[in-house]
Amino acid sequence: MRPVDADEAREPREEPGSPLSPAPRAGRENLASLERERARAHWRARRKLLEIQSLLDAIKSEVEAEERGARAPAPRPRAEAEERVARLCAEAERKAAEAARMGRRIVELHQRIAGCECC
């Protein structure tokens, strides 16, 4: 039996037919999880943008209804409509801020994926 070199003790030799060592496999798994997270963040941001679009459409219809009501002989109480519009605007602003955070997260994930040197 021959003595074990210091290099052999630290690093096991890979055989040509053996499966990948844990380091590259872990790197690929890490990259795959980053890709999945980026895709999830993209779809979350897309959903938020669709919600914002829906809110903006609701605001637009409220404003148009209010304008039609203002021209009609018997106008609706203006305070109620203004309150609804203000509430919808506040919700749209909140959703827009959340969508902006999602966008920043997507950019951050993309930069992490681009900077990953595992593959």
From Swiss-Prot:
Region spans: Disordered: 1-36
Residue ranges of coiled coil: none
Pfam family membership, one: MRFAP1
A GO biological process held by the record: regulation of cell cycle
Main function: May play a role in cell proliferation.
Record family assignment: Belongs to the MORF4 family-associated protein family.
Record text on subunit structure and interactions: May interact with CDK2AP1.
Descriptive protein name: MORF4 family associated protein 1 like 2
Gene name tied to this protein: MRFAP1L2
